């Protein structure tokens, strides 16, 4: 498959260089397990829909799923051709679309993010493409947070944002455990991932 020069124009990826690492939080709404309920016509919101309404909506969802699948695959192809490693984050479940229908397998699966300093359990998978995850041992106490669940947040003003938030402590540990070379030391507050050599 030959990709056009990013649809004939400039690309975000033109600004990346070898030595950079892309961390992609790719939209999950069409890959995650809840989409299966919609495809089967069993989502609560579809309770009073006609079969024709369900089919029309499912065709629209399938187009969106296909679009996202093409985008994530094209992104990886472009980055691989440029020699730029990428780490992709998405929810984990055995029914997740990419888990079952993508030729690249995740290299890190975190089944309980709360255990390593996040606000929620949220099982998450990470694809390390063009880079191998490190296996650094972090010998320090986890800064546990009050555990939240999506159901606790439902109906709040910023529900959509809050359910996607990741705590600084979780990110700090993840970077030091899986991305940064050498002896892992706590990352200082004013530094970011961009301040570290990979």
Can you annotate each of these PLM segments?
Residues 1-197:
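Conserved active-site and SAM-binding loop architecture
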């Amino acid at each position: 498959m030959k990709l056009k020069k990013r649809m004939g124009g400039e690309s975000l990826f033109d600004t990346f260089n070898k030595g950079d690492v892309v961390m992609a939080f790719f939209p999950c709404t069409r890959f995650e397990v809840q989409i299966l309920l919609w495809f089967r016509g069993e989502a609560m919101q579809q309770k009073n829909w006609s079969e024709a309404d369900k089919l029309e909506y499912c065709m629209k969802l399938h187009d969106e799923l296909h679009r996202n699948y093409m985008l994530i695959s094209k992104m990886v192809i472009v980055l691989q051709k440029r020699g730029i490693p990428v780490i992709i984050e998405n929810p984990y479940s055995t029914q997740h679309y990419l888990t079952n229908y993508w030729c690249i397998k995740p290299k890190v699966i975190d089944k309980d993010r709360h255990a390593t300093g996040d606000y929620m359990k949220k099982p998450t998978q990470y694809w390390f493409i063009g880079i191998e995850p490190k296996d650094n041992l972090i010998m320090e106490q986890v800064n546990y947070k009050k555990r939240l669940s999506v159901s606790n947040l439902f109906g709040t003003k910023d529900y959509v944002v809050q359910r996607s938030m990741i705590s600084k402590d979780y990110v700090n540990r993840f970077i030091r455990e899986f991305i940064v070379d050498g002896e892992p030391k706590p990352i200082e507050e004013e530094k970011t991932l961009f301040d570290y050599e990979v």
